[in-house]
Structure formats: C-alpha cells, structure tokens
Amino acid sequence: MVSIMNKNELITEILKNEVVKALGCTEVGLIGYTVAKAKPEDLYSIKEIKLILDKGTFKNAFSVGVPNTNKFGILPAVVGGLLGREENKLEVFKDIKYDEKLEEFIENKLKIEVIDSDVYCKVIIKANKVYEAETKGSHSGKSLSDDLKNAYKSLTLKDFIDYIEDIPEEVIKIIKETIETNKNLSTPEVPEDFISLDLKDEILNHMLKKTVSAVYNRMIGINKPAMAIAGSGNMGLTATLPIIAYDEIKGHDEEKLTKSITLSALTTIYSAYHSSYISAMCGCVNRGGIGAVSGLSYYIFGFDRIEESIKSFTANLPGIVCDGGKIGCALKIASGVFAIYLSLFSKVPYTNGIVGKDFKECIENIGKIGKAMKPVDDEIIEILKNKK
C-alpha cells in the first residue's frame, strides 16, 4: 500500500498530468500537434503525408470541428497542424489562419492507416526528404508510468475523500482554472436547430443547457479551450459543468465547489484507468458521468450518499457507445446529465445487473464491459471508413 503521504503526492501528480487544457477535440489536437512536429519549412514541397492512427483517434477526429478552420474532420486537422506551432501542443490550432489553397494541395497527398493501439499518432511526410514525428501514450505524448497508474487504481473512495479535505494550493489553482475555462465554453442556450431545451425543473434545465451547449460548441470547433480530464475535453466538461450549474442555482459556495470538482476529477480519472482511454463505450457519459455523480452527491449530501449515487448511475447508462467525436456527442451528454441527476435521488440494490457492492466494484464492472466491446468498436470503424 502507498503511505498516507505518498497517497497525497500520488494523487497530486496524477491530477497535474490528467487535467490539462486542450483547444478543440483532443484527437484532432493530437493529429495537428504531431503534424506540427514533423512539418518541413516549405509546405509546398510535400509529396505525401501518411498518418498512422489508433482506432480511437481516427474515430474521434473523423467528423469533429477543427478550431479556426470552419471545417470538420482529419484533413483540416492536418492542414491546421501544418499552419500551427509545435510549442502550442494540444492548442496547436490557436491563432492559425486557414489556407484553402494548402488544403487543395494536400488533399490528394494524404494517406491514413488505422491500427489497433493505445493512443497513437505517427506522421510521415515525404518532401525533399522524409520528416517523421509520433505522439503516443497520451494526447500530449507525456505519459504517466504504469506503476503510477496502478498505484492510483489501488486507491479507495475514502482516499479521495480524505484528499479533498486538504487540497494542495497547486491543485486548487488547476481546479479554479478548470472551472473558469469550462464555464467559458457554455452559452445560455443551445441552438434551436440542434435541440430545444426548456424543462420545468430549474436545476436540471440549467445543468443541461450549461453542459450541452459547451459540448456542442466544442464539437463544432469553437476557438475556446476546454480543460480535458483523462485525455478527453468532453469528459472534462461532463465531469464539471453539471456541478458548476448546480452551484450557480443554489448560490455560489467556492470551497464546496472546489472540493466537489476535485472529487469529480479524481473519480473520472479512476474510472478511465479501469477501462481504456478510448473504447467503444462512451467515456464522456460513463467516466465523466461517474465523476459528476460523485461531485454532485458530495455537494448536495456530503459523503453519505456518494456510493449509492454511483450504484444508481451504474444501473442506468453504461454501454452507450462512442461512434466518434461530433456534434451528436452533445445529445449523448444530455442523456448523461439526466442519468446523473436521477442517480442523486434513487437507490438500486447490488443484486441488479452490473451494479457493484461498492464504489470500486461498480467502476471495475463498467470497465470490464468497456473492454469487452472491442468488436463493436471494430464495426464502428468499418462504418466510418465506408462513409463517402
């Protein structure tokens, strides 16, 4: 077991690495960043660009908006990477001015290979010579060791609860940045030509509008960053904005909000580590939802109902599939917010389906289902490849 001091140091290190800023969908950011690392000085000397992508990166970049391009998908992500700066990493599209001529020049030179791997992007550019770059293990290429991740997986809900009672100042700064950054992606309303939301329940209505609008804005490629959690911006939005919305309705309590968001981030990461970063199971709803349920339950009831709320959530939405990053993700997140809200006020016994006897077993069971869905993921990839 990790000692008390080491537990807190471990948790802090995990949070510092897994709660990071990203502009646009993290998968197009990954592609753009890797292209920026590989690009030649003379872009018009390029003869071929080959991308080797893991299935999840291909899937999530396929239909999603790319910031500062007014376009969707992998091609503009590549062009954006050619125009962007490597030092901006996952914010590689920041300040770019899109070039339609460059897109026309590149379009027929782009080849894509999809492989079965964890997070992976390799770029091979043939120009006056061959330029190569790869990013693997995480979207920024900065990957935590398996030992650290396994140590984190051995922690308990009580460890997380103990941690949020005395959060280090460096983590408080990250959490405050997360709150402000993710709030900034929300708009008062969601476009009516996409979805009409006007519920009588004031709390649920505000939670839905705040969360769904932010995810929608991110998926169309709005030029504003999100704080990603465990490699996903949408997961970060789902894990934080329902709690922020509740806090706004009930009257702002900064200390309680900071603790709740921290707990949400901790349980979201914990859930991600018990599954795989990208799979056929929608991580935004399942992992981000677990986080939001944990944080909201703490905010409303204290520590007493967290485990029961997670059991109720486990009985509801796990299994919802991920068919890539796109504006439709906002609809799945809407379903997730409903499930999060229901979980706070319901109780489901351990005898029901995949519901675990405690926090840890619930998350382990959800992770097992996600890992077993590989054939589903393969079929989704084939459907996308065959789209014209």
Swiss-Prot record:
Field pH dependence: Optimum pH is 7.6.
Binding site for [4Fe-4S] cluster: C282, C322, C329
Effect of C322S: Retains 10% of wild-type activity
InterPro entries: Ser_deHydtase-like_asu (IPR005130), UPF0597 (IPR021144)
GO molecular function: 4 iron, 4 sulfur cluster binding; L-cysteine desulfhydrase activity; metal ion binding
Annotated catalysed reactions: L-cysteine + H2O = hydrogen sulfide + pyruvate + NH4(+) + H(+)
Cofactor binding notes: Binds 1 [4Fe-4S] cluster per subunit.
Effect of C282A: Retains 5% of wild-type activity
Phenotype for D323N: Retains 50% of wild-type activity
E.C. designation(s): 4.4.1.28
GO biological process terms held by the UniProt record: L-cysteine catabolic process to pyruvate
Keyword terms: 4Fe-4S, Iron, Iron-sulfur, Lyase, Metal-binding
Active-site feature positions: C25 (proton acceptor)
Uppermost EC category: lyase
Cofactor(s), names only, from the UniProt record: [4Fe-4S] cluster
Self-association and partners: Homotrimer.
Record's function text: Catalyzes the cleavage of L-cysteine to form 2-aminoprop-2-enoate and sulfide. The former then spontaneously hydrolyzes to pyruvate and NH(3). May be responsible for the production of sulfide required for the biosynthesis of iron-sulfur centers in this archaea. Is very specific for L-cysteine, with no activity being detected with D-cysteine, L-homocysteine, 3-mercaptopropionate (cysteine without the amino group), cysteamine (cysteine without the carboxylate), or mercaptolactate (the hydroxyl analog of cysteine).
Family, per entry: Belongs to the L-cysteine desulfidase family.
Name of the protein in question: L-cysteine desulfidase
Organism name: Methanocaldococcus jannaschii (strain ATCC 43067 / DSM 2661 / JAL-1 / JCM 10045 / NBRC 100440)
